[in-house]
A protein has these predicted regions:
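Short linear recognition/processing motifs and adjacent strand/loop elements at protein termini
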Residues: 2, 23-26
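Bacterial N-terminal signal peptides that target proteins for export
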Residues: 2-11
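Short intrinsically disordered, low-complexity coil segments enriched in acidic
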Residues: 10, 14-15, 59
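Hydrophobic h-region of N-terminal signal peptides that target proteins for export
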Residues: 15-24
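Catalytic-core regions of hydrolytic enzymes
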Residues: 25-122
Length: 122
């Protein structure tokens, strides 16, 4: 599946952020929880047959593969399959892991075709 350039840029920015955040840390691994939004019975936004849950799962798996190349980072996934996980459980996964960073990936959709860009909450 081909992704717009902004998805690729987002992955690069997140990778750089995590790389810089781990620089100079103690010997403890930096724990990142990757959360692919929606899943299972919750498709998220849709356009034709394309569902948000599928796109964000692909993005999270690609990002995780990149992050796992850094031996100082432990990657924890809230889901690796198309399953529904309650929001509270997603938070529990991060809290139990004592994660340093929680990244929840979504692809918002609007009917207004002039709307463009991304949003990030830290």
């Amino acid at each position: 599946m081909r992704y717009p350039i902004y998805i690729k840029k987002l992955i690069l920015i997140l990778f750089l952020f995590v790389s810089l955040a781990t620089f100079g840390q103690s010997s403890t691994k930096f724990k990142v929880v990757l959360d692919a939004g929606h899943g299972g019975k919750d498709p998220g936004t849709m356009r034709g047959s394309i569902q948000e849950k599928d796109i964000v799962l692909d993005v999270v798996l690609m990002l995780g593969k990149i992050l796992e190349q850094n031996k100082e980072i432990t990657v924890i996934y809230t889901r690796k399959l198309d399953v529904f996980i309650e929001l509270r459980e997603r938070a529990n996964i991060a809290n139990k892991a004592k994660a340093n960073l929680f990244i929840s990936v979504h692809c918002n959709g609007v009917k207004n075709t002039s709307a463009k860009g991304t949003e990030t909450f830290v």
